[in-house]
Structures are given as structure tokens and as C-alpha cells.
């Protein structure tokens, strides 16, 4: 992948990305570091070329295998809520296209990302490699189990909704750490922030949302 591919042109140009950043500001995204990344990380390389003309719309798009790339507002909101610091270790449950992965990896020291659909893993790795992001480990696995051998984590982000928060993810959250996750069924979900302190866990409910379900187990495709 060439530098020109990363920079984009026309509907993937920097001007188009800047317009997206402006819309994110209008919708309440205030973290300047997150906004800068939303304007600089090339979303168009994380989707099929047939959809590249829509890469900087605030909409979700298909990435194959019944999965989608999240809309930019959701990516920015989740990243802002996680409040990642440069020296922290983060777990992402659901690599998908790798777009949210790239944003998080640009914010933290080490990122560990799990994807249940095996066919998506090499695609994400190729795209992340093109961006020369070297602080990421991606593997095929069950997100419900987390990645205990690399925990505890300062931040855990789950861009899919389990009916209840998996116990393993709570156990892998470090003291001082934060978990951001939508919780609920297809009919009703709430976006939650879980913080672990020396005294235990605190839960903050933010708003009603609608995410794809977090599916247990693994799959080839």
C-alpha cells in the first residue's frame, strides 16, 4: 500500500476528512487528540474499495462476513470515553476491520485486540501493518474470555453488546482501569462505563445505544 493510498484523494482527501471532524465536534466530541486521529487515520483503507467514496460519511459500512465498520461518531465517542493515556495497556474485544484498533493503538502504549471471525484477522493485520503501527497484537479468539495472559488492562473497549458484561473482562480490568461496553439485547441496550478503584467497581450508565451483539465463541468466517 503506497503513501498515496494512505493519504487519499477526492472523496478520501484531507478536506473530506476535515469535514467529518467538524461534524464530530458538532455532535459533542471534545477530545482534541481523538479528533486529530479521526482526521488523520485513513478510514478508507479499512473498507472495500467499492465503498471508499463513503469512507468519511458518518455511517457504518459492510466489511464482509456479516460485519460492519462502526460509524465514525461511535468510534470517536468510545475512544473519548475510554480516556486512554500514552503509557497504558488496552484490550479491544472485536478487531473487525481494524479501524477502531488503529485509533486506540495511536493513543496507548500496547494494544491487544481479539477477533472471533478468523477470516477478518489477516485483513486487519495487513491494514495496520500498512500504517506502521508496531504496538498491536491481534489474534483470533473468543472475546468473552479476554486475553488473561496479557492482563490486567488499563482500558478495555467492547464495540459490541453482550447481554451481560463477561466476568472475564471484569477480572482483567486493572485498578484504576476503565471498561467501556454497550450492554443489553437487540431490543434495548445501554452504554456503560465501568471503573475499578481500590474500593471496587463503579458503573456509569450513559445513554441508550444500538450495537451488534457480542457473540460467544469463534468462527472461521
Locate the predicted segments by residue.
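Conserved alpha-helix/loop element of class I SAM-dependent methyltransferases that forms part
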Residues: 18-22, 26, 50, 55-58, ...
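Short clusters of hydrophobic/aromatic residues that line enzyme substrate/ligand-binding pockets
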Residues: 46-47, 56, 61-63, 147, ...
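Glycine-rich beta-alpha junction loops
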Residues: 41-42, 185-187, 209-210
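N-terminal auxiliary segments of SAM/dcSAM-dependent transferases
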Residues: 1-50
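Substrate-binding/catalytic lobe of Class I Rossmann-like enzymes that use SAM or dcSAM, i.e.
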Residues: 191-221
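Conserved nucleotide-cofactor-binding alpha/beta core module
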Residues: 83-202
Amino acid at each position: 500500500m503506497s503513501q498515496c493510498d494512505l493519504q487519499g484523494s477526492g472523496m478520501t482527501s484531507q478536506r473530506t476528512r476535515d469535514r467529518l471532524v467538524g461534524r464530530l465536534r458538532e455532535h459533542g466530541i471534545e477530545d482534541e487528540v481523538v479528533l486529530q486521529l479521526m482526521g488523520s487515520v485513513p478510514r478508507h483503507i479499512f473498507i472495500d474499495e467499492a465503498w471508499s467514496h463513503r469512507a468519511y460519511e458518518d455511517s457504518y459500512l459492510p466489511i464482509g462476513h456479516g460485519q460492519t465498520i462502526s460509524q465514525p461518531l461511535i468510534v470517536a465517542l468510545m475512544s473519548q470515553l475510554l480516556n486512554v493515556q500514552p503509557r497504558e495497556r488496552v484490550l479491544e474485544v472485536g478487531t473487525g476491520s481494524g479501524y477502531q484498533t488503529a485509533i486506540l493503538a495511536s493513543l496507548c502504549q500496547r494494544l491487544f485486540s481479539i477477533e472471533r471471525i478468523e477470516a477478518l484477522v489477516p485483513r486487519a493485520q495487513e491494514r495496520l501493518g500498512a500504517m506502521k503501527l508496531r504496538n498491536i497484537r491481534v489474534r483470533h479468539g473468543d472475546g468473552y474470555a479476554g486475553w488473561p495472559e496479557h492482563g490486567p488492562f488499563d482500558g478495555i473497549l467492547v464495540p459490541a453488546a453482550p447481554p451481560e458484561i463477561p466476568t472475564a473482562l471484569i477480572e482483567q480490568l486493572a485498578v484504576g482501569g476503565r471498561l467501556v461496553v454497550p450492554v443489553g439485547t437487540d431490543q434495548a441496550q445501554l452504554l456503560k462505563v465501568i471503573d475499578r478503584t481500590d474500593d471496587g467497581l463503579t458503573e456509569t450508565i450513559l445513554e441508550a445505544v444500538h450495537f451488534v451483539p457480542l457473540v460467544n465463541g469463534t468462527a472461521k468466517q
